[in-house]
């Protein structure tokens, strides 16, 4: 229900009071200190003073307030309020813990520009610098309008960019305040996402597994009748094994160590400060493993990561892409296990779609020849690399290589940490963490979903980052339950013929057998119930 005018006015008044009270308090606290440092780069002296940019600078206040009345329902309004308040509290805390000031004099101004600058000086002081609350709020407020008014996204983006530029050209902030403010804004959007639940709110038990499987089960069972064969109660009972939980923590510690090491070069200052972005990125990944929560990556139903997760994780995503390129070099990206069940890397999906499923074989061949001429350069670009042909001996020798003309009606994506390329066919996602054994719940759900997609669409590709681990576990579970394999050894032997590089750690094998056992029991119980009826 759309919030009433009275409710919107009340919330705006309360948030506004918090803003001015906390902002003023931190300003006066910094003013009371004997010494407040200033951080500025020498090149900033070349930044021009553009008096007219005080207009976009001030416009953020209007957009900030107007958004309260554009909210379509109470939930959207409460999310907007939560984002504003979170940014305000975090920024004010930083202002008081690490006070900075802007000491450069502003050139004299008159007319409308001068009046706007005088109005700003009336309540503002040259403190409250890093992180720039203006930058953080421009991202948060801009995200609201971006979602609310999709038809005018380009003007919104341009205006918000002008607002961000204005913090420098009005001599309100030094450059160091801009990336720190952006970090705050994106962190708030990540913590309070537009879709799904905040990664900080997901409840998890002492065994370490968050209830992602139960939530996904409730959603997935509406898409296939076969999901009703597994009781929701059984999903609540199974937990992550202590060995898997221990491995998650070890991986988290490694990423935290990487985050700490990445931050060290920033002590040299200058361009080395950008290494803090790498540190933040690895810290987010560490948080995912520390909580055992694949939802930290915020992979959406269409396979994309949220904008906030993409920005925060960008250095890590580049590393993931390079890692995929290295391990898949000279190897087939996809392979056929059965006529209707395929396995492979998430990067192989784009290759199939753009080279076969969309354009056709002749057009694709011509395109590949053209791309091959500049492949040496393009392979260094992660966003383009997966469109390139992979000519290798191992691919030619693969027992069931996926031909470029093959159709791909359905994709089951179990890769949590990397976005899926835009796909025109049927696509489903069940994000699982890399390098740890999937839970029994996850494998039960994935096998059910794989079978449902196979029955509905005839052919399914199960993919993860490389097509060696998580996707292999899902396909092995399916082979045991629906593929006619008598035991895990037979299923593994069959899968290795198609995907020789697959890996099967002991903990994953245990989870596969447990999941297959539960599914077989459910199938048997379902069959007995049908006979009795």
What are the residue ranges of the model-derived segments?
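N-terminal transmembrane-helix/juxtamembrane module of multi-pass inner/ER membrane proteins
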Residues: 1-63, 107, 117, 214, ...
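Membrane-interface loops
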Residues: 30-43, 70-154, 160, 164, ...
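Hydrophobic, membrane-inserted alpha-helices
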Residues: 61-67, 136-143, 159-166, 255-263
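PTP/DSP superfamily signal
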Residues: 196, 208, 241-321, 325, ...
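Cysteine-based protein phosphatase catalytic domain of the PTP/DSP
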Residues: 113-120, 325-381, 385-390, 394-462, ...
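Membrane-interfacial, low-structure loops and terminal tails that flank and connect transmembrane helices
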Residues: 1-4, 197-214, 221-224, 229-232, ...
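Aromatic-anchored segments of alpha-helical transmembrane domains
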Residues: 20-21, 88-96, 159-171, 258-264, ...
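Alpha-helical transmembrane segments that form the membrane-embedded catalytic/substrate-binding core
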Residues: 137-138, 173-193, 309
């Amino acid at each position: 229900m759309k919030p009433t005018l009275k409710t919107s006015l009340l919330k705006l008044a309360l948030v506004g009071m918090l803003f001015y009270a906390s902002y003023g308090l931190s300003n006066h606290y910094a003013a009371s200190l004997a010494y407040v440092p200033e951080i500025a780069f020498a090149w900033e002296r070349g930044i021009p003073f553009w008096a007219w940019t005080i207009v976009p600078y001030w416009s953020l206040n209007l957009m900030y307030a107007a958004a309260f009345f554009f909210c379509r329902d109470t939930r959207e309004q409460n999310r907007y309020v939560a984002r504003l308040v979170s940014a305000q509290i975090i920024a004010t805390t930083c202002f008081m813990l690490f006070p900075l000031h802007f000491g450069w004099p502003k050139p004299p101004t008159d007319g409308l520009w001068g009046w706007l600058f005088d109005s700003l000086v009336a309540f503002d002081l040259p403190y409250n610098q890093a992180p720039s609350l203006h930058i953080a709020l421009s991202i948060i407020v801009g995200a609201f309008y971006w979602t609310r008014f999709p038809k005018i996204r380009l003007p919104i983006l341009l205006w918000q960019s002008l607002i961000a530029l204005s913090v420098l050209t009005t001599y309100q902030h030094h450059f160091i305040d801009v990336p720190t403010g952006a970090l705050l804004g994106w962190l708030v959007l990540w913590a309070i996402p537009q879709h799904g639940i905040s990664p900080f709110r997901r409840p998890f038990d002492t065994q370490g597994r968050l209830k992602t499987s139960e939530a996904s089960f409730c959603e997935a069972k509406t898409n296939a009748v076969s999901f009703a064969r597994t009781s929701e109660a059984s999903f609540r009972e199974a937990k992550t094994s202590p060995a898997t939980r221990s491995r998650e923590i070890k991986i988290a510690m490694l990423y935290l160590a990487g985050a700490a090491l990445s931050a060290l070069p920033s002590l040299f200052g200058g361009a080395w400060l950008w290494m803090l972005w790498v540190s933040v990125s690895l810290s987010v990944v560490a948080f995912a493993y520390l909580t055992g929560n694949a939802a930290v990556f915020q992979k959406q139903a269409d396979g994309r990561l949220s904008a906030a997760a993409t920005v925060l994780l960008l250095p890590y995503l580049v590393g993931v892409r390079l890692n995929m390129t290295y391990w898949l070099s000279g190897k087939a990206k996809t392979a056929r296990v059965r006529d209707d069940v395929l396995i492979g890397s998430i990067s192989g999906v784009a290759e199939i779609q753009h080279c076969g499923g969309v354009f056709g074989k002749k057009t694709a061949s011509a395109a590949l020849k053209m791309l091959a001429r500049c492949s040496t350069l393009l392979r260094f670009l992660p966003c383009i690399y997966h469109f390139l042909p992979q000519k290798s001996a191992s691919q030619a020798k693969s027992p069931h290589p996926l031909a470029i003309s093959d159709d791909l009606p359905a994709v089951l994506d179990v890769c949590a940490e990397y976005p899926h390329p835009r796909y025109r066919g049927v696509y489903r996602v069940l994000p699982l963490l890399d390098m740890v054994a999937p839970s029994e719940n996850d494998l039960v759900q994935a096998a059910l979903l794989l079978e449902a997609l196979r029955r509905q669409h005839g052919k399914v590709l199960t993919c993860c980052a490389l097509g060696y681990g998580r996707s292999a576990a899902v396909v092995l579970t399916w082979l045991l339950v629906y593929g006619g394999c008598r035991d895990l050894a037979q299923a593994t032997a069959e899968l290795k013929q198609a995907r020789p590089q697959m890996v099967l750690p002991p903990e994953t094998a245990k989870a596969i057998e447990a999941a297959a056992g539960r599914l077989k029991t459910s199938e048997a119980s379902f069959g007995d119930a049908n006979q009795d009826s």
